[in-house]
Amino acid sequence: MKVDQMFDLDLRKSYEASELSPQASIIKTTIKVSKAVCKTLTCICTGSCSNCK
């Protein structure tokens, strides 16, 4: 699975849930996307990668 596919999946999930709670959905999606990027790129855990564990 490519990185852009992971983004697409997470964004679709956020749009489906956005009717109930847009702000909570955006926060959850942001965390999911940042974790996916960190795991994929195996970045040094700094800043945006702090929740990659």
Swiss-Prot record:
It is found in: Secreted. The modification N-acetylalanine is found at residue 24. There is a cross-link at residues 40-43, 42-45, 46-49 (Beta-methyllanthionine (Thr-Cys)). Maturation of lantibiotics involves the enzymatic conversion of Thr, and Ser into dehydrated AA and the formation of thioether bonds with cysteine. This is followed by membrane translocation and cleavage of the modified precursor. Its main location: secreted. The keyword Phosphoprotein does not apply. GO terms for biological process: cytolysis by host of symbiont cells; defense response to Gram-positive bacterium. GO terms for cellular component: extracellular region. There is a cross-link at residues 34-38, 48-52 (Lanthionine (Ser-Cys)). The modification 2,3-didehydrobutyrine is found at residues 29-30. Keywords: Acetylation, Antibiotic, Antimicrobial, Bacteriocin, Lantibiotic, Secreted, Thioether bond. The modification 2,3-didehydroalanine (Ser) is found at residues 25, 50. GO terms for molecular function: signaling receptor binding. Residues 1-24 form a propeptide. Belongs to the type A lantibiotic family. Lanthionine-containing peptide antibiotic (lantibiotic) active on Gram-positive bacteria. The bactericidal activity of lantibiotics is based on depolarization of energized bacterial cytoplasmic membranes, initiated by the formation of aqueous transmembrane pores. Lacks antibacterial activity against Gram-negative bacteria. This is Lantibiotic paenibacillin. It comes from Paenibacillus polymyxa. The lineage of its organism: Bacteria, Bacillati, Bacillota, Bacilli, Bacillales. The gene is paenA.
